[in-house]
Amino acid sequence: MLSRSHSNATMSTTRHRLLATASRFVETLESLDMDAMLAVRSSTCLHHMCCPSFRNYSITNDQTREALPQWKATIKKYKFGVLDDSQTLVDEQARKVMIRAETAAETTVGDYNNEYVFILRMTEDCNAVDEIWEFYDTIRLRDLRHRLEAGHVPIGVDAPAPFTTTASPAAL
């Protein structure tokens, strides 16, 4: 959960709304509730995976909805949250929040832990996420990908977003 240590009296309304939306984004990722995850996003939200070793690509809300069930099927236990509140950055003018996050999951092929940096651009009213840039440790993901392959769990275009290695035709 993002720290709310700043006094509401001293925090600008824009900053408060940006942080509140970022906090909702984190909470919905932890919940893995698809409807909640999409509710915090604008209808035109694009999610950019920014890791060249897995090929950069972007996915829409519809593609996220298609991919999540397969990802959830590999998870037994899951935890996601902000790694370090002190590294959260807010750019009010650009309506962006950067967070450093971590995940710990028990999957069908063993433990998976990773760190992420998310840059979230919010809508004009700051109440929804309009664009997401996600950066993650590709070595850790590559290890999980190899374990999934060895376990004959689908990867590639039809795999959940974190394991997709090429853009789907709709994303091109």
Swiss-Prot record:
InterPro entries: Fungal_Meroterpenoid_Isomerase
GO biological process, one term: terpenoid biosynthetic process
Taxonomy, superkingdom: Eukaryota
Pathway given in the UniProt record: Secondary metabolite biosynthesis; terpenoid biosynthesis
Note: In A.calidoustus, the austinoid gene cluster lies on a contiguous DNA region, while clusters from E.nidulans and P.brasilianum are split in their respective genomes. Genetic rearrangements provoked variability among the clusters and E.nidulans produces the least number of austionoid derivatives with the end products austinol and dehydroaustinol, while P.brasilianum can produce until acetoxydehydroaustin, and A.calidoustus produces the highest number of identified derivatives.
Complex formation: Homodimer.
Protein family membership: Belongs to the trt14 isomerase family.
Role: Part of the gene cluster B that mediates the biosynthesis of the fungal meroterpenoid acetoxydehydroaustin. The first step of the pathway is the synthesis of 3,5-dimethylorsellinic acid by the polyketide synthase ausA. 3,5-dimethylorsellinic acid is then prenylated by the polyprenyl transferase ausN. Further epoxidation by the FAD-dependent monooxygenase ausM and cyclization by the probable terpene cyclase ausL lead to the formation of protoaustinoid A.
Protein name, UniProt field: Austinoid biosynthesis clusters protein J
Gene name as annotated: ausJ
